[in-house]
Structures are given as C-alpha cells and as structure tokens.
Amino acid sequence: MGLKKFLEDIEHHFEPGGKHEKWFALYEAAATLFYTPGLVTKRSSHVRDSVDLKRIMIMVWLAVFPAMFWGMYNAGGQAIAALNHLYSGDQLAAIVAGNWHYWLTEMLGGTMSSDAGWGSKMLLGATYFLPIYATVFIVGGFWEVLFCMVRKHEVNEGFFVTSILFALIVPPTLPLWQAALGITFGVVVAKEVFGGTGRNFLNPALAGRAFLFFAYPAQISGDLVWTAADGYSGATALSQWAQGGAGALINNATGQTITWMDAFIGNIPGSIGEVSTLALMIGAAFIVYMGIASWRIIGGVMIGMILLSTLFNVIGSDTNAMFNMPWHWHLVLGGFAFGMFFMATDPVSASFTNSGKWAYGILIGVMCVLIRVVNPAYPEGMMLAILFANLFAPLFDHVVVERNIKRRLARYGKQ
C-alpha cells in the first residue's frame, strides 16, 4: 500500500463525524506535507498553481539553511577559540568534562583543542543550536495545534518559518526555558490572539525576541552571551564600534582585528543566524527569485540605511563613534542583513502595495540607523525598527489606496 493510498483510506476518520475528528488539524498537516491538496475554488476566478502556502513556507525554511549551517559552524569555532584562549591542559580538560556541550562533541568524535577542524566546530555549534530549535518548534507547535483544534481549522504553515527564524536570531547560549517563553509570546500574543496566520500585524519571531530583550536582557544582550565558552566575555563587533570606532574591532578570542570581509563572511560572534551576510544573501536571492520576498522592500531598506548613515558620516561626531560608521559596515554588522532579507519581507506584517513597500522599507532602514547611532544604550536597531514599521505598514497601504482612488475618480468621475 502506497503512502497516498494509506492517507486516503484513513481520511474519513478525521473528517467531521469521524472518531478522530478533533485530530483533523494534525492529519491535514501531515497529508499536505507530502501531497498537494486537490481543493479548488467554488467561484471564479480560478487559478491553478501547485505552489500553496505550505510550499512557500518550505522554500523560506530552506532559504535560511546556508545561514543556519554557517551559524552553527561559526558558533562552534568561536567557542573553541575562546576556550583555548582562556584555558589549557588539565584546566581545559576539567572545563570540557563539566559542560555537556563540550563532552558530547568529543564523544561524537570531535575535539575541543585549538586544531579542531570544521567537523568539530559544526558539532559543537549544533549542540547549542539544535536544542534551541527543537524547544522552539515543540513549544510553538503545541500552541499552534492547540489554537487550530479550538478553532477547528487546519494547522497554519506560517509557524514552520517562525520557529526557525526565532531560533536563528537568539544567542547560542540562550536558556531553553527562555526560548520556550519567547516563542510562546510570539505565537500566542503576537499572532494567535489576532486571528492566526495572515492576520497578525507584528512579526511573531521578532515580537518573541523583543519580549525576551525587555524581560530578560542579561540573556539576550551584553557581552556574556554571544560566545558559547564558559567564563568568556566578549562584545559583538557592533558594540565594539560603538565604544571605540573601527579601531576597536578585535576578536577577543583570537586577538585578531576584525576586517569587513570577516564580518561579511561571518567570522564574528553574534546570534546564530545573523553573522554571515554572504550566507544570508544566498538564501535571499532564492526567495526573491521565487517571488516570495519583495525586492522593493529590500531596496527600500538599503536606500533608507545608506541615506541616513551617509548623512551621519557627513555630520560627524567626536564623542559618538557610531556617527562615523559607513553604510557598508552597517550592512554586515548586527542583525541588519537578516532583518532586511527575512524579517522585513514578511508578507503578512509588511505593506502589500508597491509604493507602500518602498515607504515601509525606507522607514526600516532609517529607523535602524537612527537607533544604532543616536541611542547610546542599544547599539542594535533592526529588531525595533522592523516592529515599528509593522505598525505603520497598514497606514502606508491606506494612503496609497486612497490616493489611487482619488486619482481615478478625478480621471473618470465626470464621464
């Protein structure tokens, strides 16, 4: 018996009146994961397309894989470098024995020595990322299924993307209970309360991270959370620039200066999925080509960022080093690239009119630079900039639609 035949034979048990009716949401999610549903619209207009919401979400999920794999490799590499910088000999062995991430890596064939290869770095990074992702997926999935069962509709595939995006924008050292709490806030408060997928006006992943930032700032920001090494403290490159300009960009674990190419490739501490602009560009090119992400929004974000950062460069400052950060550094530091490619382009919380997308993107770019440069307490600004722009997205669309209506009335109203 083939899989499709098996799913068809048991379908009636999950339909209204069947003995497993309450589990229809789970059955539908599993069935449509493997096969495109044969549903058609009952009224005109009819559009036939095998790419449904689930396929779109899977494409976005696959698009973040380059950043995810590089992030695991980089997280492991940064941790190993920091450990060997702080400890050696018996002291290093004792540290490894006391941390399950370290000894599990060695048990699986890796090494924590300074000559560790890419496999060891990937293994160590995976021991940090995969538990976070699994926690986020299970806890968030529980809330998603619960709301679907209460509302008696199919599981919304939007969480498939929300879960991995959230896991990629947090530090590798985030406690698992906080990861569960953050995704709970994002799914329940920022999405399901407003009706679920397609009705939320805030990006759920960013809303969850913002909740953690304000509720538990010690585990989501500062100098202790970005490198997964016991006893190690090291600021992100963005924080270092804020403190002393380009000359302050030093990788404390290796003692080497951080170049622009290091930041572009992703050889710097940071959130798991945000460090490599190159990997993010690869994924972004795919979803833009597939028509999932709007190039207008991405272009607007770049325009807003370049214009305001250049203006600050011209103004200059002797007391605030962030005034002197060029636009190409803004692009590769912090969460700018990840936010621009995968958060700002969220089709639900972003503007949907073409002109609105430009305004929405420009606002994000401007607000990100403004927060980074002017706010001395918070060097990163992309998260707050996108959430702020989410609030204005409906206004942009309303203005565009009203202007189009007035223009057409003026053109054809008297005929």
UniProtKB/Swiss-Prot annotation:
Keywords: Cell inner membrane, Cell membrane, Flavoprotein, FMN, Ion transport, Membrane, NAD, Phosphoprotein, Sodium, Sodium transport, Translocase, Transmembrane, Transmembrane helix, Transport, Ubiquinone. Its cofactor is riboflavin; FMN. It comes from Vibrio cholerae serotype O1 (strain ATCC 39541 / Classical Ogawa 395 / O395). One of its GO terms (molecular function) is FMN binding. Belongs to the NqrB/RnfD family. Its main location: membrane. It is a multi-pass membrane protein. GO terms for biological process: respiratory electron transport chain; sodium ion transport; transmembrane transport. It is found in: Cell inner membrane. Disulfide bonds: none annotated. Changing residue 226 to L: Decreases riboflavin content. This is Na(+)-translocating NADH-quinone reductase subunit B. Its EC number is 7.2.1.1. It catalyses: a ubiquinone + n Na(+)(in) + NADH + H(+) = a ubiquinol + n Na(+)(out) + NAD(+). Composed of six subunits; NqrA, NqrB, NqrC, NqrD, NqrE and NqrF. GO terms for cellular component: plasma membrane. NQR complex catalyzes the reduction of ubiquinone-1 to ubiquinol by two successive reactions, coupled with the transport of Na(+) ions from the cytoplasm to the periplasm. NqrA to NqrE are probably involved in the second step, the conversion of ubisemiquinone to ubiquinol. It comes from the Bacteria. The chain crosses the membrane at residues 23-40, 56-76, 129-149, 164-184, 275-295, 297-317, 325-345, 358-378, 381-401. The modification FMN phosphoryl threonine is found at residue 236.
